[in-house]
């Protein structure tokens, strides 16, 4: 009896091959169609990106780099990766790109391996101030392998405390200074960071995972003229598949990063994901992407303004980007309770600590909201004003009825459903 796959192996659809997984995917599609996604780190990719990521390139091993592989049969995956590299360089105005990191965290780890030795000092924004785990937080590898110094924000306005940055840099002489974060809503003065880095002889790295798409769209400052190296995810505002990327204009750093990614921390790259990255980068080069990026920021400001009118505080007083931190203390609510109630109303977000938060990280005094995904659906300023009113209604209901907010949630959920019907996805 032959052990070779039968014709059914190549023809049987997922719905028949594995009904349980198919059901989970179908239910997730319905969730995305029927809920307003307000998680700042999430977006909705095009059908073209989905097709590329679900392609036969998932079958191919391709250790190495285009033209220098350790496997045969790479001529076509080389095309996809070369397109991703050249398009990334065109988008961000740089001479080097590595598109192989499988996540933003691995992109950061690749930079650390290329430029640092265990025990070196790094400096990044503290998690409590809006930074990211991989910028030196104690539970993360970056906080275990390196001496991590953390800067924060000013108490009066929740913006980067450059006096503290300068003092810490001069005191600790870090080898690497990191700018960027996961919950910082304002533009960052990259030139000032670079000046501080040069003064103490440090490399300057920008993690633009959250705002890369805004840079691509021309509505947020480009860090490449200032940073030695830039890392990013390829999803979030860039609207590609989940993955990472490293950019630079320094050829020597590029060579070190290539070695750090492969063979340093990764083996075979995910070629189906890289194909999806190439498609997304091609989309980001089109004129309509600039309109999208501008709309993301316009929508964020409209949402923030509406929430302020509804009696909520916005950390730092507003936003220059796609995200905002909402301080719930004026309503005497926690982020944990608000996240749950908003999800019951059909609006997905995440609880998030705010600067100088008195609550535990598992509870928090705030929520983080973002506009990229709903903007991709087609929401404009008026729709986001409506979303802000719905959030206000749900939170007011929760403040009045903390044990049972089902009535306010149901009213909001009906209006959320109507908005989602007006702006469908994947029909």
From Swiss-Prot:
* Pathway entry: One-carbon metabolism; tetrahydrofolate interconversion; Amino-acid biosynthesis; glycine biosynthesis; glycine from L-serine: step 1/1
Superkingdom, natural source:
Bacteria
Q: Subunit structure, briefly?
A: Homodimer.
Family according to the record: Belongs to the SHMT family.
Q: Which coarse location class applies to the principal site listed for this UniProt protein?
A: cytoplasm
The protein's enzyme class: transferase
Q: Which reaction does it catalyse?
A: (6R)-5,10-methylene-5,6,7,8-tetrahydrofolate + glycine + H2O = (6S)-5,6,7,8-tetrahydrofolate + L-serine
Q: Which organism is it from?
A: Paramagnetospirillum magneticum (strain ATCC 700264 / AMB-1)
Keyword annotations: Amino-acid biosynthesis, Cytoplasm, One-carbon metabolism, Pyridoxal phosphate, Transferase
User: What is this protein's name?
Assistant: Serine hydroxymethyltransferase
TM spans, by residue? Answer: none
Zinc-finger among the record's keywords? Answer: no
PROSITE patterns recorded for this chain? SHMT
Query: Which cellular component appears as one GO term in the record?
Result: cytosol
Q: Does the keyword rRNA processing apply?
A: no
Which positions bind (6S)-5,6,7,8-tetrahydrofolate? 127, 131-133
Alphabetical GO biological process terms: glycine biosynthetic process from serine; tetrahydrofolate interconversion
Q: Name one GO molecular function term.
A: glycine hydroxymethyltransferase activity
Q: What does this protein do?
A: Catalyzes the reversible interconversion of serine and glycine with tetrahydrofolate (THF) serving as the one-carbon carrier. This reaction serves as the major source of one-carbon groups required for the biosynthesis of purines, thymidylate, methionine, and other important biomolecules. Also exhibits THF-independent aldolase activity toward beta-hydroxyamino acids, producing glycine and aldehydes, via a retro-aldol mechanism.
- EC number per UniProt: 2.1.2.1
Q: Where in the cell is it found?
A: Cytoplasm
Q: Which residues carry this modification: N6-(pyridoxal phosphate)lysine?
A: 236
- Which positions does the site annotation Plays an important role in substrate specificity cover? 235
Q: What cofactor does this one take?
A: pyridoxal 5'-phosphate
């Amino acid at each position: 009896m032959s052990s070779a796959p039968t014709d059914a192996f190549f023809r049987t659809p997922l719905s028949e091959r594995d009904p349980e997984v198919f059901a989970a995917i179908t239910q997730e599609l319905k969730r995305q169609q029927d809920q307003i996604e307000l998680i700042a780190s999430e977006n909705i990719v095009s059908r073209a990106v989905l097709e590329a990521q679900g392609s036969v390139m998932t079958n191919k091993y391709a250790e190495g780099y285009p033209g220098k592989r350790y496997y045969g049969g790479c001529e076509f995956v080389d095309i996809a990766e070369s397109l991703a590299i050249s398009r990334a360089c065109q988008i961000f105005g740089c001479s080097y790109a590595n598109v192989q990191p499988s996540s933003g965290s691995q992109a950061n780890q690749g930079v650390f391996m290329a430029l640092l030795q265990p025990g070196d000092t790094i400096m990044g924004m503290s998690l409590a101030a809006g930074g990211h785990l991989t910028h030196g937080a104690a539970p993360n590898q970056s906080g275990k392998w390196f001496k991590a110094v953390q800067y924060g924000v000013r108490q009066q306005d929740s913006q980067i405390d450059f006096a503290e940055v300068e003092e810490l840099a001069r005191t600790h002489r870090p080898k690497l200074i990191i700018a960027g974060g996961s919950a910082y809503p304002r533009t960052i003065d990259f030139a000032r960071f670079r000046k501080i880095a040069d003064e103490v002889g440090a490399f300057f790295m920008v993690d633009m995972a959250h705002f890369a798409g805004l840079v691509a769209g021309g509505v947020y400052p480009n860090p490449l003229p200032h940073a030695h190296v830039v890392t990013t995810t390829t999803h979030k505002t860039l609207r590609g598949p989940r993955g990472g990327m490293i950019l630079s204009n320094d050829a020597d750093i590029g060579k070190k990063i290539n070695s750090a990614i492969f063979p340093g921390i990764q083996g075979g790259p995910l070629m189906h994901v890289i194909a999806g990255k190439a498609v997304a980068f091609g989309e980001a080069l089109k004129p309509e992407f600039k309109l999208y990026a501008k709309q993301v920021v316009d929508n964020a400001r409209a949402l923030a303004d509406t929430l302020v009118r509804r009696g909520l505080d916005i950390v730092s007083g507003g936003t220059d980007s796609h995200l905002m931190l909402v301080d719930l203390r004026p309503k005497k609510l926690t982020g944990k309770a608000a996240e749950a109630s908003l999800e019951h109303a059909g609006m997905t977000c995440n609880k998030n600590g705010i600067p100088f938060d008195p609550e535990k990280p598992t509870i928090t005094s705030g929520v983080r909201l973002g506009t990229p995904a709903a903007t991709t659906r087609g929401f404009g300023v008026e729709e986001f004003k409506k979303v802000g009113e719905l959030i206000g209604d749900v939170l007011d209901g929760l403040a009045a009825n903390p044990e049972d907010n089902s009535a306010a949630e149901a009213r909001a959920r009906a209006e959320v459903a109507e908005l989602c019907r007006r702006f469908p996805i994947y029909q």
